[in-house]
């Protein structure tokens, strides 16, 4: 069954194993996760658990939001996400979800919004090769051929310069190196999408090896 939690990316560091192996890890702080609603097939057509993350001031939330969180006897939340394929019996409305739902060695998927890079060319954005830099070449970092003459247009999906980054990215099959219950922190092996302080969604891997 799926387990999930929301957190903020603190940054990256490194830890050492007992045999001296260095492991780069991403630190994710996952405090203030509260179960807001349990959805069932009878009432909603599917099963899921709705989790709210990070308190926000009541004046910043509207009446429907305040009424929704009042059923869970908690404060308005800044982020609300759903996790499907869960065991609903393990969750109680209004209960806090802590990082100990995961254990060291668990394989997870991490979802976040990638860093925005602004307007970029095809070499940086799509990894294309540049042209010759000498011998009279006047073609260096341009997109290249736009296609044949006959259609009198550029085909859809042609790789061109444009806005790069700022997209939702999921990195699969990452390993949890350490779970710190006291500080509500997860250490995940490798990098996780997003800038520092960005929202990160952690859930059980769908394609675990």
Swiss-Prot record:
Gene Ontology process terms (BP): translation
Keywords for the protein's UniProt record, in alphabetical order: Ribonucleoprotein, Ribosomal protein, RNA-binding, rRNA-binding
Molecular-function annotations in GO: rRNA binding; structural constituent of ribosome
Signal peptide: none
GO cellular component assignments: cytosolic large ribosomal subunit
InterPro entries found in the cross-reference section: Ribosomal_uL3 (IPR000597), Ribosomal_uL3_bac/org-type (IPR019927), Ribosomal_uL3_CS (IPR019926), Transl_B-barrel_sf (IPR009000)
Keyword Ribosomal protein among record annotations: yes
Segments for region (Disordered): 126-148
Assembly with partners or alone: Part of the 50S ribosomal subunit. Forms a cluster with proteins L14 and L19.
Function: One of the primary rRNA binding proteins, it binds directly near the 3'-end of the 23S rRNA, where it nucleates assembly of the 50S subunit.
UniProt family annotation: Belongs to the universal ribosomal protein uL3 family.
HAMAP family, sorted: Ribosomal_uL3_B (MF_01325_B)
Protein name, entry field: Large ribosomal subunit protein uL3
Gene source species: Listeria welshimeri serovar 6b (strain ATCC 35897 / DSM 20650 / CCUG 15529 / CIP 8149 / NCTC 11857 / SLCC 5334 / V8)
């Amino acid at each position: 069954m799926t387990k999930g939690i929301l957190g903020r990316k603190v940054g990256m560091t490194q830890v050492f194993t007992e045999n001296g192996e260095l492991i780069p890890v991403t630190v994710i702080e996952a405090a203030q996760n509260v179960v807001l609603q349990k959805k069932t097939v009878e009432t909603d057509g599917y099963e899921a658990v709705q989790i709210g993350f990070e308190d926000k001031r009541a004046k910043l939330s509207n009446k429907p939001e305040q009424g929704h969180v009042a059923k869970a006897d908690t404060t308005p939340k800044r982020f609300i996400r759903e996790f499907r394929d869960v065991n609903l019996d393990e969750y109680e409305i209004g209960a806090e979800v802590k990082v100990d739902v995961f254990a060291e060695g668990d394989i997870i998927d991490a979802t976040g919004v990638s860093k925005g890079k602004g307007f970029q060319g095809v070499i940086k954005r799509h990894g294309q090769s540049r042209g010759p830099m000498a011998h009279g070449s006047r073609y260096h970092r341009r997109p290249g051929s736009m296609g044949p003459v006959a259609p009198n247009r550029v085909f859809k999906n042609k790789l061109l310069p444009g806005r790069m980054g700022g997209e939702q990215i999921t990195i699969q099959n990452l390993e949890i190196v350490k779970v710190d219950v006291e500080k509500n922190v997860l250490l995940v092996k490798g990098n996780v999408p997003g800038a520092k302080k960005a929202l990160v969604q952690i859930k059980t891997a769908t394609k675990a090896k």
